[in-house]
Amino acid sequence: EVTSFFVELDNATQSEWVGELTKRITVHEDTEVSVCILDTGVNNGHILLSPILKDEDCYTYQKEWGTHDHDGHGTKMSGIIGYGDLQTLLENREPVELNHVLESVKILPPTGKNEPQLYGAITSQSISQVMIEKPHRKRIICMAVTSSEHTTGDGRPSSWSAALDELASGYIDEQQKLIIVSAGNVYDWDNYPDTNIVSSVENPAQSWNALTVGAYTEKTLRDLKKYNNASTVAPKGGLSPYSTTSVIWDDKKWPVKPDIVLEGGNVLKDSLGCVQCEELSILTTYYKPFERQFDTIWATSAATAK
């Protein structure tokens, strides 16, 4: 099936698909491996997320923010981090064994924005909070949050990227950490790939010590007639139209970023321009499961979650 098939089902039918999948899931709850998601919070009431994200593993930088997902992004990240290719799992009948659990720290406020000079401190304190609560876990830290407004544009460090470098190195606490961060996104697709080449990886993904994830794509359209013979912007196996790069940086001074690329989806193009398309995105979990179970995710967020 195509991604849009699952997204367009009514909630009752989506719930049946999810219910069938849950019967095949085994979560090894004694695992010490966790993925800590720094984002908008996660709504772990979703039937696919509740077995792998306990209430006690949901944190927030500011108590008054709550731990819930006010935006949807954190829950979309969780579906991919928890299950990988969710669509493939739905389409087959194989047992699913999960050897990791999730943790969530809400680092973005429900209203307004954090002060830019606090980005590094918020990230550092949020990671420390989780490590203090569950010090025994083997933890991967995942953050698909970047700032285009406060990007140096040429690879130079910022206070935020420096904080990631310090955290990853274990300079303060002598505990090295795997921190995975998204490269940041491009939304001017008409001039692909020229725009991607001149669009800098965003702050704080210029961090030397973090693993920066960009996006490529294998996504193509099976039935172009459905879209009046439109085409995809990127070729199969090419750089995703969403991905920033470090081509314009001085590679004698600064790192080459992103470090790796994973599936981030493609974009549809016709005579009128470019547009996002569900079939060229990745299926994941929706943050309001009483309305529907599935949503789609794309760009370097999807790639980072992979």
What are these regions (language model features)?
Residues 18-20, 117-132, 233-248:
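A Trp-anchored, charged/polar loop motif used as the substrate-binding/catalytic surface
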Residues 1-26:
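Autoinhibitory propeptides
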Residues 24-57, 64-118, 152, 174-176, ...:
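Subtilisin-like serine protease catalytic core
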Residues 62-76, 156, 293-306:
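Gly/Ser-rich catalytic serine loop of serine hydrolases
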